[in-house]
A protein has these predicted regions:
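Conserved beta-loop-beta/alpha segment of the NTase-like Rossmann-fold superfamily
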Residues: 78-149
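Conserved alpha/beta core of the MobA/IspD/sugar-nucleotide pyrophosphorylase nucleotidyltransferase superfamily
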Residues: 16-20, 173-255
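A conserved acidic beta->alpha catalytic loop
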Residues: 72-75
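N-terminal nucleotide-binding beta1-loop-alpha1 segment
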Residues: 15-35, 85
Length: 255
């Protein structure tokens, strides 16, 4: 249950303040030259940077404990620290390890905590939602040239597992937003403690691979977001589709 503290910030009855971690260390190799001198988090949709929109939504939801894990183009994030009450955690090994390493750096924080990919585009403030279980946002989307992690759910929208899809049809896939509670965090920490070093260095490795262990042992819910409210930037085709969504649904409202 969410309540309000004396300062107006949201917290759960267990005494934990809601917080957020944004993972933004990756290079974004599929964008080639476009990400050579720019982190994907700094791409603009309309006139707003992706990372700024995430931060603004978090602040509007009353979440003040915000950490950004940086790596590629780390120096560019300093301007955000000047303008917003955020913490910066530099993953110095971002070029050597996959994003499992970024997750390991902040896993101790994942108790009543939002976990967000820095390349997740949002047109709606989803951070005002309250969940009783660890919850992963999902969306129907096409792979668009990149493998996607398909979410397997039961009739109650509990996540049962995942598999990789490289086809052309739309599938229910993970969006880069999740809300973590203590039970799932403990399983994740245990899984990370047994992870072999070579798995952290595998180029195509992703922290979502660890979710199989989490969903086996605790209840994790899926929350499907309509495609008009956002998306993630895995490929150039994704970017083009998100721009089209913005132009169709949101451009006239944000003038």
């Amino acid at each position: 249950m969410i309540e309000k503290a004396a300062d107006g910030l949201p917290f759960f009855t267990g005494g934990f303040y809601m917080k957020a971690v944004i993972l933004a260390a990756g290079v974004g190799h599929r964008f080639k030259e476009l990400t050579k001198y720019k982190n994907k988090a700094f791409f603009t949709i309309g006139q707003t940077m992706v990372i700024k929109q995430i931060i603004q939504y978090l602040l509007q939801a009353g979440i003040r404990d915000i950490t950004i894990v940086t790596g590629h183009r780390h120096e560019d994030f300093s301007i955000l620290k000047k303008n917003y009450p955020i913490h910066i955690l530099y993953n110095t090994a971002y070029g050597e390890y996959n994003n499992i390493h970024s997750l390991a750096l902040i896993a101790e924080q994942l108790n009543e905590c939002w976990l967000i990919h820095g390349d997740t585009v949002l047109f709606k403030n989803i951070f005002k939602e309250a969940f009783t279980h660890t919850t992963f946002y999902t969306m129907l989307k096409r792979p668009n040239g990149a493998p996607v992690r398909v979410v397997e759910v039961d009739e109650q929208h509990h996540i049962q597992g995942f598999h990789i899809d490289r086809g052309e049809r739309r599938v229910l896939s993970l969006l880069g937003v999740s809300y973590w509670r203590k039970d799932a965090q403990m399983i994740l920490l245990e899984t990370l403690s047994h992870l072999h070093e070579k798995e952290k260095k595998r180029f195509d490795g992703e922290w979502e691979e660890l979710l199989q262990e989490v969903v086996k042992k605790v209840e994790v819910d899926a929350y499907q977001l309509d495609r008009k409210y956002g998306g993630d930037l895995n490929t150039m085709k994704d970017y083009q589709e998100i721009v089209e969504t913005y132009d169709r649904y949101w451009k006239s409202m944000r003038k």
